[in-house]
Amino acid sequence: MDQSAVLAIASFVRNRSELKARKGLFQDKPTDFFRYKRFVRCLKSDAYKKKSLKQPDLYPPLPEDEEKFAELARGIFVEFIKNQLVVPGQKLHSYECKEHGLKPSKDYPHLIMSTKATLDDNEYYLWHYNPKTLTDYLIVFGVIGVILAFVCYPLWPASMRRGTYYLSLAAFGFLGVFFGVAIIRLIVFLISMLFIREKGGFWLFPNLFEDCGFFDSFKPLYGFGDKETYTYIKKMKKQKKRQAKKEKLKKLKEKAN
């Protein structure tokens, strides 16, 4: 297969919702990974069929026969591997991370490279292909535009310079208020630990420094310990999901027996 066709198909598949790509850590760097069967699903999508009708030289039409389709899909994916666009990988569980000298992450699973690519439906593959998107180009042009705007600051009209002055004052004022609130909440917490240590202390804006949205950082207004924090709530939701999966598997085993 021509390399331009391989890159075209990879670019098409790369950010498709059917691929259900997830974030993982490969060599401590965020990397997208997916299952082989999701790649096959992308090729079966209506969007790919439209592409193949318009540009059959870049997007080869896929046969209706399942065996021939599977063979062609495997051939395309083998080209992905040969061109190092993807590599076979393995998702590690927490206990497996320790065996490989990796520290388990709360947010992303750790990934390692596999030595074989069997193209099984549930086999994981890691993306090594990261084409530039329109957003990337817009960010570059935006940064250049901002730099040029500041370089030309002396040429700005007086009204614009006055506006940026007041805007900068407002920004510094916001930062001052933010750090003021952070200091006050720390003082209140330290004092509360003298009286309600068993509750984990009293926090104003318990989610202020949590990894959540801007407005969510100020919800709720107060809380005790870490039970109101975004991280704790997220952790409890994950535990409930795991427990539900375990119970489901247990019921299936009981039915099988």
Swiss-Prot record:
Transmembrane segments: 138-158, 171-191
A GO cellular-component term linked to this record: Sec62/Sec63 complex
Alphabetical GO biological process terms: post-translational protein targeting to membrane, translocation
Subcellular location: Endoplasmic reticulum membrane
Topology term for the membrane: Multi-pass membrane protein
Residues exposed to the Cytoplasmic side: 1-137, 192-257
Pfam families, per the entry: Sec62
Keyword ATP-binding applies: no
Segments on the Lumenal side according to the record's topology features: 159-170
Major localization listed first in the record, in broad terms: endoplasmic reticulum
Keyword annotations of the record: Endoplasmic reticulum, Membrane, Protein transport, Translocation, Transmembrane, Transmembrane helix, Transport
GO molecular function, one term: protein transmembrane transporter activity
UniProt superkingdom: Eukaryota
Function: Required for preprotein translocation.
Family designation: Belongs to the SEC62 family.
Subunit structure, interactors included: Part of a complex that contains SEC61, SEC62, SEC63, SEC66 and SEC72.
Protein name: Translocation protein SEC62
Species of the source: Candida glabrata (strain ATCC 2001 / BCRC 20586 / JCM 3761 / NBRC 0622 / NRRL Y-65 / CBS 138) (Yeast)
